[in-house]
């Protein structure tokens, strides 16, 4: 959890926002996945948001569903994902690592065991996409027992009670949802979200990172202008992977270009 606090402190001192890329672990293969993640970090990623491939991803659009299918085709399992995570942490000791998950994968070997594994490999936060806040108590408790930040989604229509609860129980960062629906670069994020960011700040919530539909530098600037501490981009990155599976060198060149441009937009 401290890695997020350190990151936001350093960025505030530099007057920068955070740019956080999302990819599926093991896409298109475990070895290439590590290459991709090294490339994202070298290009300027401030933190990582990583998915463990799941067979029935309700919140994901087709781009991220296809990434899971590619990982499955390469034989990726949750156990292999944890091996990849351990390797990332060993190479990159300071970058915050977040997981974006589905509850079935957390339940699989028991909630406590899951968070224990996260702590062992150096994961900082876990967001469970299909667990609403009202049902999150057992996950929150296990997360905090193991020093993992529980991340909550703040939807665009959140009422005051929910904002207070998220502020009170969330750690690390707050996932500010641009809009309802599924992920996808085609579905542009809807702003402004200033009122939500203001309320979250008033209630001392963890810094807000805006996600869903963030695919170009102008949207990163808009997120920061609305008061968010940064932006998360997934589908746009996974699309670059999808289009270049057969040309890994070109893939890494394009990923570097994309992340460099998105990170540049966080500098005021």
From Swiss-Prot:
User: How would you classify this enzyme at the top EC level?
Assistant: lyase
Q: Which Pfam families does its entry note?
A: Trp_syntA
- Keyword entries, A-Z: Amino-acid biosynthesis, Aromatic amino acid biosynthesis, Lyase, Tryptophan biosynthesis
Under the heading NCBIfam families, the entry gives: trpA
Purpose: The alpha subunit is responsible for the aldol cleavage of indoleglycerol phosphate to indole and glyceraldehyde 3-phosphate.
What does the sequence similarity comment in the record state about its family? Belongs to the TrpA family.
The protein here is known as: Tryptophan synthase alpha chain
